[in-house]
């Protein structure tokens, strides 16, 4: 009765340019590169179909449900400027397609099988609009920016961090010693590298103990609250939570997770534990470039950043704009706003395809890390502002006099930049002069300035705005 077997074009069902999006729809912007001979309407409709209710042929069970209620719809297609065969296809998904509070389920639908679809040469998810109705089903960050500042009693400046190097091979005691030197020199945080988990040369429990000792000793000496991102990432969720429990028992303020390699289910579980037990959660994005670096295939980091804000994390690495790792300024500032702000307007010049309302979900502090040193401090302070963590690994530990003087140099530099900014000086124009002035009364900063005066990482960004 009305069931007609066979294959029909996707666009007959899933391309609906007259559709008016609802406030409750999840909206997606895909960069679609169709195979030669496939019209953009068919390609866009195929994406909508394969990431929602469709399959390659008509099935009789379609008659048992309301397709109009549940299908994804490609409602707009724009050619990409300067490209002959690329299109931005906008797809609207009804909210009922997704399990509440599950980033895992959201991604399984939207970026699941469709990425292997033969009719497409390449496919990239550029942005998502998450509706308030769906956001409200997530806890989000365990604490958020304001609560973190209150817990740490640190206001009015960027926070300073340092990744302990060499990233692998140190014993737990030597590792703790390196943390202590950095913290007593003036840093707020030290950090486990993302691949430090629990290896034969340094088991996790030993590391946690010696790092806790470093935290308490440096706090006693400086009168400031200190932290070390203890990486709780593990082979199973149960083991990860066990490590977080031990961190809580030690009384340290913050733990860490590699959210892409660990997975969103594990990350959300850890974020819930952290909120329930007063731990801050630092998130590392190891593996992100596998997904987000190619311009025409994969998923843009702004989508991974939004997903993290839903899943939960208090800090996330967000590129530097000035260091050794990929990140164009306008694009980076676009997703930094999406991490921190309550409401972000659509702004294609910064890669933001949709207006996003976060309806009181706490913000995430962006972490700038990777190939940065004291000469970058004015630019970083200007670009990222106060609600950020500036992380100098080699830029602290590479100081010719050792870790503590390296930490002193960074602390003096950031305090000088904040003071200059507060006095109304232009950090972009006067940055080098500000650092030079400060180095006159800080021999540690002067030595750091000398070591890194010529160093630059200058390559063209791969992922640029159209």
Curated annotation (Swiss-Prot):
PROSITE patterns: RUBISCO_LARGE (PS00157). Mg(2+) binds at residues 191, 193-194. Its cofactor is Mg(2+). InterPro entries: RuBisCO, RuBisCo_large_chain_AS, RuBisCO_lsu_C, RuBisCO_lsu_C_sf, RuBisCO_lsu_fd_N, RuBisCO_lsu_N_sf, RuBisCO_lsuI. GO terms for molecular function: magnesium ion binding; monooxygenase activity; ribulose-bisphosphate carboxylase activity. Coiled coil: none annotated. Its main location: plastid. Belongs to the RuBisCO large chain family. Type I subfamily. This is Ribulose bisphosphate carboxylase large chain.
